């Protein structure tokens, strides 16, 4: 039985049926007294966190639930730097103050290390708030993959202007 078969009354589940097609339901926990459901899905391709949130919100509303949590569990080989926008969504929702430091950042994944290059400074703040560790935990839980996270500060306006001064001195 597929995810879309169980929650067939949800318009969002039908809208995003392709995202969940051929995936498996690993686990369903029902807490009747709290009207809460927890589902662990194993999709065959990564699914945007915004899709998961929209589907969960609709299921909660349509089925009159108090809460629903949808967890995703992917094959390790599906992880790449292309998943970074989903990591950003998770981190900025969990740590509201991190959004300004992560805005414009980019990621590369190679040899077991996810390297995040910030557009500005902010590495120290992100590290002191445990962002790197949270990313490791998220990837471990979703992909069964252990990785290292490296955060690199980007240029600031001061760096830019000092480079112009160096250029103008020639």
Each predicted region: which residue ranges?
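Intrinsically disordered, low-complexity basic tails and flexible linkers associated
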Residues: 1-170
